[in-house]
């Protein structure tokens, strides 16, 4: 290199010769170094080790600092083997870039390059460099704009939400622990609100056949390890059979069967009366009148029977509710009395005042007075 060029860097006339008048720091923190690369690379113009490489337009965005539209000279990058297309994409690779000997040690340019590498960390792992493909095989040596894109941060919430599975269709072994707890709570709420005491006891026997239930128990704890796929299947089928909707369906079926039987009896009577009218033409009008009267009476009786059936069903429901309420009150009173006795016994045992207690029974025999007693004396 010429001595004049080194003197230009060592003893510059201007305080900052590497930055042109256009290169300035704006208020937004953007550094425009459009002529920086050309002046920097001119010191190595005569180095035969560097391969000619056409000027590129490149953009860098790192930590809020933008270097835009910089025309670099052909010797800014080191020699690249143009035979392989993938080598052009490795210009920004950390390992390949650090192996480039752009500036020899001891030169002013090496100091400038070290300051550049200090200002822009090329091995910054926070960025994922995206380099669009350039058509090198067709003779185009111009690289596209290199735009760093910030990858997705792992701390950002994932937009994909887990779909809520239908637990009524899953076997017990296929559920997670949270799903098992959730499904047990759902079954407990459904059974306790929609079924009677007998159905609840049956379901408890299905889940745990060895369970001991006393009349004073008001709750039953279901252990997760007691349930299996087969038991859960039986519980589901039992709930499906004894649900309130199924009970209403069975009651309506009983009503329809009863009304059908009564209707068949009425129709048999009408057929017999019509056959009698065919034998005796003289009494045909009377038989038809009797048939119409019997039909109307049958309709009335069927209506009354339906009303009586619904009334009896409502009365049975009221009686069952009343009995269950009384049973609950009795159980509550018994439980309260037992708790009171236990609390009293615990107090007596803690105080120690009744350790030597003896219970004595005293009986007084009253003598019958034969004569009258004068109370005035």
UniProtKB/Swiss-Prot annotation:
InterPro entries: FAM199X_fam (IPR029672). Keywords: Coiled coil. Residues 321-349 form a coiled coil. Residues 240-254, 339-350 have a biased composition (Basic and acidic residues). Residues 256-301 have a biased composition (Low complexity). Residues 319-338 have a biased composition (Basic residues). Residues 240-350 are annotated as: Disordered. The keyword Coiled coil applies. Pfam families: FAM199X. It comes from the Eukaryota. Belongs to the FAM199 family. PANTHER family: PROTEIN FAM199X. This is Protein FAM199X-B.
């Amino acid at each position: 290199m010429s001595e004049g060029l080194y003197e230009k860097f060592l003893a510059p006339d201007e305080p900052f010769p590497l930055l042109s008048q256009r290169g300035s720091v704006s208020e937004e923190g953007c550094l425009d170094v459009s002529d920086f690369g050309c002046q920097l690379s001119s010191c190595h113009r005569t180095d035969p080790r560097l391969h000619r490489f056409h000027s590129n337009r490149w953009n860098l965005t790192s930590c809020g600092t933008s270097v835009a539209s910089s025309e670099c000279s052909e010797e800014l990058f080191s020699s690249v083997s143009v035979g392989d297309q993938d080598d052009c994409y490795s210009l920004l690779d950390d390992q390949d870039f650090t192996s480039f000997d752009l500036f020899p040690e001891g030169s002013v340019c090496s100091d400038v390059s070290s300051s550049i590498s200090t200002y822009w960390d090329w091995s910054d792992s926070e960025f994922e460099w995206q380099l669009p493909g350039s058509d090198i095989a067709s003779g185009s040596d111009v690289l596209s704009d290199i735009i760093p894109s910030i990858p997705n941060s792992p701390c950002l919430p994932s937009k994909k939400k887990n779909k809520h599975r239908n637990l009524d269709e899953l076997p017990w072994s296929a559920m997670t622990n949270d799903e098992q707890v959730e499904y047990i709570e759902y079954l407990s709420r459904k059974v306790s609100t929609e079924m009677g005491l007998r159905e609840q006891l049956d379901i408890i026997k299905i889940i745990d056949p060895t369970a001991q239930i006393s009349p004073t128990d008001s709750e039953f704890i279901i252990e997760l390890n007691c349930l299996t796929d087969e038991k859960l299947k039986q519980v589901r089928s039992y709930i499906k059979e004894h649900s309130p909707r199924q009970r209403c369906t069975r009651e309506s079926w009983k009503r329809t069967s009863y009304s059908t039987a009564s209707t068949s009896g009425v129709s048999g009577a009408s057929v017999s009366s019509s056959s009698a009218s065919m034998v005796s033409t003289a009494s045909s009008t009377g038989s038809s009148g009797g048939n119409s009267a019997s039909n109307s009476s049958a309709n009335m009786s069927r209506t009354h029977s339906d009303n009586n059936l619904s009334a009896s069903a409502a009365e049975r429901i009221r009686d069952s509710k009343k009995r269950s309420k009384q049973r609950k009150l009795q159980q509550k009173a018994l439980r309260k009395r037992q708790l009171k006795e236990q609390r009293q016994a615990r107090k007596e045992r803690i105080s120690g005042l009744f350790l030597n207690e003896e219970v004595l029974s005293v009986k007084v025999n009253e003598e019958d007075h034969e004569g009258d007693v004068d109370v005035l004396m």
